[in-house]
């Protein structure tokens, strides 16, 4: 749910990525252009209810991992998705990102954060344009919550 636009909801499940603009009465499928329609982590841009971020995962029988060994965050636009990969590992990055392991903060530009089951936290302080490892060698990250402390 977008904090400033409670009518706008996003949903990702085992059969697609969806958006509702009427508090969940109707849903539109918005995963066209993603490499997979399966994945868990998703967060909404703090100021633009039309933009969300997700990390599609390649479904395997017993695990879910970043696609093709590359870690890619996708940012939605009006009718398309854009890859955001600068600073993310692009080779041998067979990482899993769990359902609640992605969030955004309220800064401008927005900070976007996600954690992996391998114990890494990735952070972007520019709406997802560039990424860095904010923490590594942690236990599995099951949930990420961003907070701004002033």
Task: Identify the function of each model-found stretch.
Residues 1-150:
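Extracellular glycan-interacting surfaces
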